[in-house]
Curated annotation (Swiss-Prot):
Subcellular location: Nucleus
Species for this entry: Mus musculus
Subunit structure comment from the entry: Interacts with importin alpha, leading to stimulate both RNA-binding and methyltransferase activity. Interaction with importin alpha and beta is required for its nuclear localization, importin beta dissociating in response to RanGTP, allowing RNMT-importin alpha to bind RNA substrates. Interacts with elongating form of polymerase II and RNGTT. Interacts with RAMAC, this interaction significantly enhances RNA-binding and cap methyltransferase activity.
Record's protein name: mRNA cap guanine-N(7) methyltransferase
Sites marked mRNA cap binding: 197, 203, 228, 277, 359, 456
Regulation: Methyltransferase activity is activated by RAMAC.
Length: 465
């Protein structure tokens, strides 16, 4: 990483090099002759998906042996408590992969010609039942997650990984709110889509917004989110805090506009963190999610979020000898290789103590194309590595990384031990120390944690005038 100070942050030599995606996968517009969203020819898009994956896979094979990932920012981790309470059940998706240098070519994609379902009433009854079953499973999973205090979270194996993801979100949210303030200084309204237990409430307070609508499928999570909000208000009697409403709904099947207290409400920002991929079970659900996210945005408003990178997931899957990959922190299991439909491409994801629920692959060029229906333009899409490398150059962002304990101290303090006991999980930090003249300690993520978080990307769309 670049920056005035130096530190080793998860410089994983086996993790995939960033910035090698083909144009269609890197957040750029699709070819101008691509049909409108509602008229997208699915077999054609499916073919483009396959071609993109093959190109992506080839570029990684060429680059991975010679490129060493080095995240270098020198951080001394001193605080014992994170300034930003991210929430124990925020949708932190994480994947990884010990990827070999000789990756097999991708299998043939399913080219079955079938039309996109334009309306809910055209979805076969059997499919509707399957979707209802999956939605119930997602809601049940997040409802069953227990609230965990700060002391307990600090003992978690993924404590730093979750803080790192939380830092990514903090920077993303903060910068987008600053963009909004360039055109309006008051009455900023936000929709938090898939808000979970309210892990981003503190971010919205710090962002000095005026009004927040939280929506999530899990009713117990929503009650906990509302309680967090009430607790926040009680702790800050003399400080203005945004008004809020809380909606329990499946945001991929129900229209939120029908549930708003104010049916004429519009938003400046919609944030969907680690959640939009659940909607890609079907075209109808993905479109409903986008309608909720973008349909009520003001001109110049933003749809922001984080989601798994489909190219990285498939790359690691194809490099695996089985239908699954992962490490001691997380696992991802697909049903089979070589068949990656645009919708309903399910995989099972497990993250230590946080997530254990089916998810769906999001082909980002398709998401970009579908968003055009709501007059949305992609303004950027970056991997977590690319986002980190860019934002860590700012000293304020660097200090926030420290305050949030988003990196682990290496070497460990004499009275403590490293988060991972796995052999080789800190070789990147040890090697960096040998090669660099830096003062100790360093801030880093273990190799296992970096393998998990490095499959994610950050995105931002803007509502056109």
């Amino acid at each position: 990483m670049e920056g005035s100070a130096k530190a080793s942050v998860a410089s994983d030599p086996e993790s995939p090099p960033g910035g090698n995606e083909p144009a269609a996968a890197s957040g750029q517009r699709l070819p101008e002759n691509t049909p409108p969203c509602q008229q997208v020819d699915q077999p054609k898009m499916q073919k483009e998906f396959g071609e993109d994956l093959v190109e992506q896979n080839s570029s990684y094979v060429q680059d991975s042996p010679s490129k060493k990932r080095k995240l270098d920012v020198e951080i001394i981790l001193e605080e014992k408590h994170s300034e930003d309470d991210g929430g124990s059940a925020k949708r932190s998706k994480l994947e990884r992969g010990d990827v070999s240098e000789d990756e097999p070519s991708l299998g043939r994609l399913n080219q079955t010609k079938r039309k996109l379902q334009p309306q809910d009433d055209e979805v076969p009854q059997k499919l509707q039942k399957l979707e209802e079953g999956h939605s119930s499973a997602v809601a049940a999973h997040y409802n069953e997650l227990q609230e965990v205090g700060l002391a307990k979270r600090s003992q978690s194996r993924i404590f730093y990984l979750r803080n790192f993801n939380n830092w990514i979100k903090s920077i993303l949210i903060g910068e987008i709110l600053e963009k909004v303030r360039q055109r309006k200084t008051r009455d900023i309204t936000v929709l938090d889509l898939g808000c979970g237990k309210g892990g981003d409430l503190l971010k919205w307070r710090k962002g000095r917004i005026s009004r927040l609508v939280c929506a999530d499928i899990a009713d117990i999570s929503m009650k906990q989110c509302q309680q967090r909000y009430e607790d926040m208000r009680c702790r800050r009697d003399n400080e203005h805090i945004f008004s809020a409403e809380f909606i329990t709904a499946d945001c991929s099947k129900e229209l939120l506009v029908e549930k708003f207290r104010d049916p004429e409400m519009y938003f400046d920002v919609c944030s969907c963190q680690f959640a939009c991929h659940y909607s890609f079970e079907s075209q109808v659900q993905a479109d409903t999610m986008l309608r909720n996210a973008c349909g009520r945005l003001n001109p110049g408003g933003y749809f922001i979020g984080t989601t798994p990178n489909s190219f990285e997931l498939i790359r690691r899957l194809e490099a695996s000898e089985t239908e699954s990959f992962g490490n001691e922190i997380y696992t991802v299991k697909f049903q089979k290789k070589g068949n990656y439909p645009l919708f309903g491409c399910k995989y099972d994801f497990n993250l230590e103590g946080v997530v254990d629920v089916p998810e769906f692959l999001v082909y980002f060029p398709l998401l970009t194309e579908m968003a055009k229906k709501y007059n949305m333009k992609l303004i950027y899409k970056k991997t977590f590595l690319e986002f980190y490398e860019e934002k860590i150059k700012n000293n304020e962002n660097k200090m926030l990384l420290k305050r949030m304990q988003a990196l682990e101290q290496y070497p460990a303090h004499e009275n403590s031990k490293l988060a991972s006991e796995k052999v080789g999980d800190y070789t990147h930090a040890a090697e960096y120390l040998k090669k660099s003249q830096v003062r100790l300690p360093l801030g880093t993520l273990s190799k296992s944690e970096w393998e998990a978080t490095s499959i994610y990307l950050v995105f931002a769309f803007e509502k056109q005038q």
